[in-house]
A protein has these predicted regions:
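Extended alpha-solenoid helical-repeat scaffolds
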Residues: 1-171
Length: 171
């Protein structure tokens, strides 16, 4: 069996990219994940990096988790088959996450990739929406608006919460 130069280059690039993703320095991990977003156009290059990218969602630093969410989003947007359980993964991440920026990014991911999961999350946290971060509230308002355009079972609840949140934002 002979290896082409092109195949060896892919293997070498995968190794070079996966090493910084496992680096102990959180900035290097985050920067590598940001780079991964930019090259999320080649499935062969991304495939060996998926497990490391998923593990970065559980990193102790929010900078790494935030960039891991973006990387998963970029990969899922281009190649759904590489991370078929990404909406469920983001939903469980969203429930467990404490950092407001990471929560907002994961929620935006759900809003773009699985509106049903985004609405499910909004319904599950409905009573605590006024106490959430403003950026997450704005994203929730957008999801409620989009959900109300459809014939949704949550339409009345969505309209009332949009009015409440809109009045909170004006003050």
């Amino acid at each position: 069996m002979t290896w082409s130069v092109f195949t060896l280059t892919y293997i070498y690039l995968s190794i070079l990219i996966s090493q910084p993703q496992q680096h102990p320095n959180e900035y290097i991990r985050g920067a590598t994940l940001r780079f991964l977003q930019k090259i999320a156009k080649d499935a062969e290059l991304l495939e060996p990096l998926i497990p490391t990218c998923r593990s970065c969602l559980e990193h102790r630093h929010s900078y790494v988790r935030k960039n891991a969410v973006f990387a998963v989003y970029s990969i899922y947007r281009e190649f759904e088959h590489l991370i078929p359980d990404a909406p469920e993964l983001m939903y469980t991440f969203l429930i467990a996450e404490t950092d407001s920026t990471c929560k907002r990014n994961a929620f935006v991911f759900l809003a773009h990739c699985s509106m049903q999961k985004a609405v499910e999350y909004v319904v599950s946290i409905y009573d605590t929406i006024p106490s959430l971060d403003e950026a997450l509230q704005m994203s929730i308002i957008e999801v409620i608006r989009l959900d109300c355009k459809n014939d949704s079972t949550h339409r009345v609840r969505g309209i009332s919460s949009t009015c409440i949140l809109s009045s909170l934002m004006i003050i």
